[in-house]
């Protein structure tokens, strides 16, 4: 099986009317794939691309009006296309000459083509000499020169065109062995996802591919979840703690007790709705807002340990198999034993990944030795006697055990939605959330590279949409509870001096465009951005029968996202960890 190779882009530069399009069409032959310039950008100075062969793309750009320098810096191979001797336009403008000399200085292969006008075939030798002298005077004499006749594209045999084709293929094959493999960095994309993106592109073009990736990103954690927080007092206090809000914040529960079920969508995930449900004398009026007949899960809030009468009040609000859990606001007691067992197992598995007991603990089963010691009568009694729902004490640091318990008790889709909707309340919760974000990071990375391709400008920013990455990083920073307001809220809850927890963070915020660009440049490395812009779409073509998934845009975006997420996770673990003794 041949080793994967990189994609090579040869850019044809020349004045308008110099014959670039006809030359590329002749080199590509019939039935070629073309990357069209986006609507409304035909005169914007953006190259169009054609797939000439597996891993070889030919682009053309008229200079003027476009400035050749920035695009020439993106090409793996540069071809100067000079017009015939007729006309008043100079065949080699100063800008073209400067771009070509800069390419040679960078080590970019350079070729030159002089297209003859109709009737100039008899003067081919003279045209070759004149063009060679022109190139020598411009410091470009090292470039191989080709002088095809005017009717070369329509003839079956054209030695000069064939010679140019051989040189192009030879140069491309040499470069393909040096460039990163086309699919390098896309290992996280499964074959099904990659095929779906390509199918969307082939069906509806770049916009369809963008829509497919964007829709998949929006579906992450999009399951509907209606979570009731019911009680006679302090219902709003528990709701605000779960959402990471202070009283008076937008979206927080009002100070007055609710008189009927009231919805509070999670700020970042409106598909997750927390409902305050008053019980007893506080429910004084019929519900005005339509609400579920049965909630997906319910949290019973009581001042102390809930009684059987308290549980009886809320059982009709959920289906028999729905999660039911309690919170006591006096802070007394401990987390349920199964949650404590799971935390111990998780800590052990963090230190020793081979500890097979962690799975049993995770399910709340307990040690097998305890099970073996029980008598048949004990086992029968456990089956007949229904255990009461677990109860969590409310502490200043939040309710981390409650969130973990709910995520285990809910169906997978709703558990994922809840994980992404609520801010983490412990280092372990932050690690779980970061793992979920990391698993889906390929979607915003791919969206950033495709979105940039829809509105290209030369340079690394073309291959990767900086604004989209900036927004994604800012969203993740909020999701992990690293906004200054969230950090200050935790400092107040723990009775710490202002700024104590903020000093533990290292990830810069707010996320600026300059910060994202610096990270992209640092990740890509100096001198490796050549071809990034022109190859950003190349992953949509088959290469050698395999998926060609190249483009520095995706690899840089994915690398920057994962690196930043690791830094944010370290900050979240530091902020959510126990305070130091001297604080």
Swiss-Prot record:
Chain intervals with Acidic residues compositional bias: 332-341
InterPro entries: G_IRG_dom, IRGQ
Keyword annotations from UniProtKB, A to Z: Autophagy, Coiled coil, Cytoplasmic vesicle, Disulfide bond, Isopeptide bond, Lysosome, Phosphoprotein
Chief localization: other
Gene ablation phenotype (knockout): Increased CD8(+) T-cell response.
Motif interval(s): LIR 2: 381-384
GO biological process, one term: protein quality control for misfolded or incompletely synthesized proteins
GO cellular component: autophagosome; lysosome
Function: Autophagy receptor that specifically promotes clearance of misfolded MHC class I molecules by targeting them to the lysosome for degradation. Acts as a molecular adapter that specifically recognizes and binds (1) misfolded MHC class I molecules following their ubiquitination, as well as (2) autophagy-related proteins, promoting the recruitment of misfolded MHC class I molecules to autophagy machinery for degradation.
Assembly notes: Interacts (via LIR motif 1) with GABARAPL2. Interacts (via LIR motif 2) with MAP1LC3B/LC3B.
Protein name, as recorded: Immunity-related GTPase family Q protein
Organism: Mus musculus (Mouse)
